Amino acid sequence: MKASELSKEEFKPYFLTYINKALDFDLKNGLQSSLNHTISFLESLPDDKLEYVYASDKWTVKEIIQHLIDAERVFAYRAMRFARGDKNNLPGYDENQYTPSSIANRRSKESLINEYTNQRQSSISLFDSFTNDMLIQIGLAD
């Protein structure tokens, strides 16, 4: 499955910005490639920049990393439910509510990178387990 194979009826308009930014890899190669690039990028960041925030109501770099982890976990769970044929409307989540309780700024860069890597590898394993028919299942989520 590639981003270019998606029809606009298969996702909410909100996600089009993100889908358009995705390179047109097949899913497995895209997940692995972005894992490698993201880890290289995160490892290159100086520690003194990880708690940088450009405005008082914005997230730090650590909080952004934690958001990536949390969002991938939520979306992988949704994908599993859709692949299994779940037709229930899945609840949304408020990433802005998650951020303060994530305590991301108390974590080390290594801890965040480790969790990101583990979550991405888990997502890759999950998507590897899906057949093509499972990958094209459509579900509802707020």
Write out the residue ranges for each language-model feature:
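Aromatic-glycine hotspot motif
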Residues: 1-61, 73-142
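Histidine-centered divalent metal-coordination motifs
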Residues: 67
